[in-house]
A protein has these predicted regions:
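Alpha-helical segment proximal to the catalytic Tyr-Lys
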Residues: 29, 142, 191-193, 254
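Substrate-binding pocket helix/loop in short-chain dehydrogenase/reductase
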Residues: 111-114, 118-123, 226
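Active-site helix of classical SDR
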Residues: 137, 179-182
């Protein structure tokens, strides 16, 4: 440990966007269990459109129970001003960031055929799912490079939560598929660009995971899973994705930058 570091700096810090619920919540709790202090970003609303802190505060409580410190920050990742303020708040609170998990993501508010989908829906989904993480990574990567110069013995990693939709056609939610395909290329680009600084960049591709997002199509996927759409015939759980993030956080894949990790019950396998 660099002699300049104070005692308060010893615990690693991870940022998890969309960290209040679902996959993000599971990742945040998993990282807290590994000894990270955790920053969770969220942008939750109640059913009637009011800002909602309920899920974020529950996640904060569960992280604290692991003995970790947690900072909850409400921010819209698609907003440049929010991203800048968000990163500044992390710097002010913890003074470091060792890991960024770009997890925040949305589905279209209404599934619509490709020939009927609206530009407003496209802009919303691409803004949150692709533009947001693309430019948040830019901000955090620059900060990581600065840290790497000052503290060369630390390790820095970025994880993008993609989707099997990055390569699977779903014409009723084309904007979502395009956003996740973009995340795949974003991962390769940043892995290439940041390798010289020792910053590993990875993509995790979840399959059919039981979350709020998939609850609206549960009956459909129950049948597909029972019929064998995945070799492992069960719903994936947020904790399955969190375990993959854990392996990266522990440095077990540091020579595998740019790698895609499928957490999909074998969906990606081509079978006859």
């Amino acid at each position: 440990m660099n002699a300049k570091e104070s005692l308060k700096d010893k615990r690693q810090v991870a940022i998890v966007t969309g960290g209040s619920r679902g996959i993000g919540r599971a990742i945040a709790i998993e990282l807290a269990g590994l000894g990270f202090n955790v920053v969770i970003n969220h942008y939750d609303f109640t059913a009637d459109g009011r800002p909602d802190e309920t899920a974020a505060q529950k996640t904060l409580s569960d992280i604290a129970a692991k003995g970790a410190r947690c900072l909850v920050l409400r921010a819209d990742v698609s907003s440049d001003a929010d991203r800048v303020a968000f990163v500044k708040a992390v710097k002010d609170k913890f003074g470091r960031c060792d890991m960024l998990v770009n997890n925040a993501g949305v589905a279209p508010l209404k599934r619509a055929d490709l020939l009927e989908a609206t530009e407003a829906s496209f802009d919303r989904v691409l803004g949150i799912n692709l533009k947001g993480p693309y430019f948040l990574t830019q901000l955090v990567a620059k900060w990581m490079i600065e840290q790497q110069i000052q503290y060369p013995n630390r390790s820095y990693r970025i994880v993008n939560i993609g989707s099997m939709s990055s390569y699977t056609s779903s014409p009723a939610r084309g904007e979502y598929c395009i956003s996740k395909a973009g995340v795949s290329m974003m991962t390769m680009l940043y892995a290439d660009r940041l390798a010289e600084f020792g910053i590993g960049v990875f993509e995790i591709r979840p399959g059919i995971i039981e979350t709020d997002m998939t609850s609206v199509v549960k009956e459909k996927y129950d049948k597909l899973i029972a019929d064998g759409i995945t070799p492992i015939k069960r719903w994936g759980q947020p904790e399955d994705v969190a375990k993959a993030v854990s392996a990266i956080a522990e440095g077990k894949l540091d020579f595998s930058t740019g790698q895609v990790i499928n957490v999909d019950g074998g969906f990606h396998l081509r079978r006859l």
